């Protein structure tokens, strides 16, 4: 190819694109400039969309040409050309991605198209040889029809009725003419039978092909049906998940509306808080009782002393009021043990003080018990926290 013949290269490329049935628009200005964005769509179409067999080969090799950057796409294409087609391009990957070398790029694309078309024809030819249906050999026994006397009788009766309807016509034939007619009739029957035999064979072959179906159709239908079933299952699962999501969203909205303006606390935390509040209240009560104890003792002592003083005064008054003559007239000098003697006064005072001390002791014991219980509760709460 002469250098500078860009138009000739574009004509060759157009011929290759016609063989591929390329449906997209071609950027001729980009081809002339050597812009890689004009060449890459043609390469991707030839490898992915033109032939399903070549696309299957690429998938089996684990090569993906879709959803890639230009550099990775060119790297994958060069790998396919090297491993599958044994073709080494003139330009390097970096040169192909530059805006130059338009003629050589067009030549590379033409070579790629030729390699792909050739490989496609080889694969389809092999598949046709493998999948040719075996012709059924029709024997003479199969072609023979079964004779039923009832059908013959019906046909004869129909012919007799038709002959009765027609007018009788009698002709006289000589022996030689009759023999010639019979020979012509036999030869015509043989020719018709010979013509019907190949047509019947063709009809049987076509019927077998229809019944058996082409292997390509069956091979294509089975994966397609499996894919459709998988897609249906996935759609059903997606619909179920969407319904669950809708239910969850509705429940969340109802919870948000019901819990709006409220504070949610765990049950254990709430119980701990209640226990601590009770402990604090008991501590305050105990402290207040401790502060009130000396005042209470002082008041109780003051009351008891005032009572004793009042009793002593009342006893003295009663003693002064009793006349001495009354004591002398009785004939004995009796001493009022309970009222007049100082020993009795001391006994009464001691009994009163003992009773008040007992009451205060009981109260103090109760308070100490409460203090011990609260201290144990505080220790337990500290250990648990």
From Swiss-Prot:
Major localization listed first in the record, in broad terms: cytoplasm
Name under which the protein is recorded: Centrosomal protein of 44 kDa
Record-linked InterPro entries: CEP44, CEP44_CC
Biological role: Centriole-enriched microtubule-binding protein involved in centriole biogenesis. In collaboration with CEP295 and POC1B, is required for the centriole-to-centrosome conversion by ensuring the formation of bona fide centriole wall. Functions as a linker component that maintains centrosome cohesion. Associates with CROCC and regulates its stability and localization to the centrosome.
Record note on quaternary structure: Binds to centriolar microtubules.
GO cellular component: centriole; centrosome; cytoplasm; midbody; spindle pole
Compositional bias of kind Acidic residues: 194-204
Species this protein is from: Xenopus tropicalis
Pfam families hit by this protein: CEP44
Lineage: Eukaryota, Metazoa, Chordata, Craniata, Vertebrata
Example GO BP: centrosome cycle
């Amino acid at each position: 190819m002469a250098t500078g013949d860009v138009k000739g290269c574009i004509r060759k490329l157009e011929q290759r694109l016609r063989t591929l049935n390329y449906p997209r628009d071609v950027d001729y200005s980009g081809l002339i400039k050597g812009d890689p964005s004009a060449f890459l769509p043609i390469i991707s179409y030839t490898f992915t969309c033109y032939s399903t067999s070549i696309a299957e080969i690429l998938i089996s090799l684990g090569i993906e040409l879709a959803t890639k950057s230009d550099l990775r796409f060119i790297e994958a294409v060069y790998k396919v050309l090297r491993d599958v087609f044994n073709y080494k391009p003139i330009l390097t990957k970096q040169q192909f991605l530059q805006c130059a070398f338009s003629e050589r790029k067009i030549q590379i694309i033409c070579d790629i198209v030729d390699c792909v078309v050739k490989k496609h024809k080889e694969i389809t030819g092999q598949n046709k040889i493998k999948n040719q249906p075996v012709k059924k050999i029709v024997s003479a026994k199969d072609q023979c029809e079964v004779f039923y006397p009832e059908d013959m009788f019906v046909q004869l009766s129909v012919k007799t009725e038709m002959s009765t309807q027609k007018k009788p016509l009698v002709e006289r034939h000589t022996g030689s003419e009759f023999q010639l007619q019979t020979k012509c009739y036999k030869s015509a029957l043989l020719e018709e039978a010979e013509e019907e035999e190949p047509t019947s064979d063709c009809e049987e072959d076509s019927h077998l092909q229809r019944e058996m179906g082409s292997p390509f159709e069956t091979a294509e239908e089975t994966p397609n049906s499996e894919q459709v079933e998988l897609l249906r299952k996935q759609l059903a699962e997606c619909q179920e998940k969407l319904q669950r999501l809708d239910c969850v969203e509705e429940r969340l909205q109802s919870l948000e509306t019901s819990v709006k303006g409220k504070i949610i606390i765990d049950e254990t935390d709430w119980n701990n808080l209640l226990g601590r509040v009770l402990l604090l209240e008991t501590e305050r009560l105990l402290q207040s009782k401790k502060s009130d104890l000396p005042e209470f003792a002082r008041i109780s002592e003051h009351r008891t002393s005032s009572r004793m003083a009042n009793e002593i005064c009342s006893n003295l008054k009663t003693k002064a009021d009793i006349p001495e003559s009354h004591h002398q007239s009785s004939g004995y000098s009796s001493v009022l043990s309970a009222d007049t003697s100082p020993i009795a006064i001391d006994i009464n005072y001691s009994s009163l003080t003992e009773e008040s001390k007992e009451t205060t002791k009981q109260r103090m014991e109760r308070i100490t018990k409460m203090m011990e219980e609260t201290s144990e509760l505080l220790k337990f709460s500290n250990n648990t926290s």
